[in-house]
């Protein structure tokens, strides 16, 4: 393995993270399209392992990677201030509402007999999705930027948050509660696992952005690739072994290890302490695999997928717009391979839809800039 020198302070993007995010985007689209077809029936011997692979890649290797990369990016963002993150919080809440509109409301408007009336799904407008989680994570990043010159205090605050989250999740990981009020239950679900209203509750998942943030800070101190890989492999294997042993001792489901969907989905969505530790192990080894892929392809694959990684926000929104519009058809699909073909179409549609949106946004920005310059010239 080449022992090349790193200059982290000059790095704007880490290719391994870009590659992981791009793979996570692809897996994310396929799992969301797959989930939109609840009546799929295996029709060949290879269907079952293929379904397992889709479910596995669409869980911790996707959501966990996005959240870890979120923390990584915050640590490498030298220009951002606490105000920057508060502004992003507002933007992400608005985007979360828009996404929930397309994910929940559009199917009900198109086919209320299948998906329920708009009134019945109304609380879903604030349903937990990764954008709501990301919005609340901005509060943590704002605090870290405010404490950037006080690393000991910042580390203590981070450790305290992780400790509190682990304790809360240890108590509530395998429990659910409901008040009977869908609006209130959905709101509570933004922060803690609540019946069927939570997917990425803040207390359950904030550990991943925190790990990403501090991993990036440690990375900045690295001097060569070999030391980074050795540390990542060691901690990843240790996390997996520890979580496996503890699960064997306490008899918890191995669905936590694989990240696959099971009857105990709560173990994944509520992110129990063991699940979080195991999730870190999976992502750490993914990082090593991404490094090996880059070495084998001379970074060509990372360059090819780099644009997809940069446009993750736009692609995420575009895929939910398309899935929302296609939901009445997807819910009737029973063949896995038809679902897969639709997934491929949604992936390409999301990618090029995001590209079109970015192009339009760029042209509008340029047009506004020209008008401002022209106004200044006339005034002068």
What is the predicted role of each segment?
Residues 1-380:
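Alpha-helical transmembrane segments and their immediate juxtamembrane cytosolic regions
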């Amino acid at each position: 393995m080449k022992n090349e020198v790193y200059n982290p302070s000059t790095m704007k993007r880490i290719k391994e993270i870009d590659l992981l995010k791009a793979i996570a985007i692809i897996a994310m689209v396929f799992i969301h399209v797959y989930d939109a077809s609840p009546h799929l029936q295996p029709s060949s011997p290879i269907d079952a392992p293929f379904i397992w692979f889709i479910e596995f890649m669409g869980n911790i290797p996707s959501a966990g990677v996005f959240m870890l990369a979120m923390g990584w990016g915050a640590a490498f963002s030298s220009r951002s201030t606490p105000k920057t993150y508060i502004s992003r919080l507002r933007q992400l809440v608005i985007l979360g509402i828009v996404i929930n509109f397309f994910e929940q409301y559009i199917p009900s408007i198109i086919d209320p007999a299948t998906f329920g009336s708009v009134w019945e799904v109304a609380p879903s407008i604030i349903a937990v999705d990764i954008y709501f989680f990301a919005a609340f994570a901005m509060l943590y990043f704002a605090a870290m930027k405010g404490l950037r010159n006080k690393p000991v205090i910042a580390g203590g605050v981070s450790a305290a948050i992780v400790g509190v989250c682990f304790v809360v999740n240890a108590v509530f990981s395998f429990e659910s509660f409901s008040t009977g009020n869908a609006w209130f239950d959905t709101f509570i679900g933004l922060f803690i696992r609540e019946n069927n209203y939570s997917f990425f509750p803040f207390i359950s998942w904030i550990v991943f952005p925190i790990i990403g943030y501090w991993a990036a800070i440690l990375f900045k101190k690295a001097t060569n690739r070999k030391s980074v890989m050795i540390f990542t492999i060691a901690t990843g294997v240790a996390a997996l072994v520890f979580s496996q042993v503890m699960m064997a001792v306490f008899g918890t489901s191995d669905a936590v290890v694989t990240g696959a969907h099971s009857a105990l989905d709560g173990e994944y969505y509520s992110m129990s302490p063991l699940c979080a530790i195991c999730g870190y192990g999976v992502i750490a080894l993914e990082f090593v695999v991404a490094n090996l892929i880059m070495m084998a392809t001379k970074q060509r694959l990372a360059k090819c997928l780099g644009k997809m990684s940069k446009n993750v926000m736009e692609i995420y929104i575009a895929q939910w717009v398309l899935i929302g519009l296609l939901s009445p058809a997807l819910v009737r699909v029973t063949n896995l391979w038809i679902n897969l073909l639709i997934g491929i179409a949604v992936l390409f549609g999301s990618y090029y839809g995001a590209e079109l949106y970015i192009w339009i946004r760029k042209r509008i920005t340029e047009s506004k800039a020209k008008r401002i310059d022209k106004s200044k010239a006339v005034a002068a």
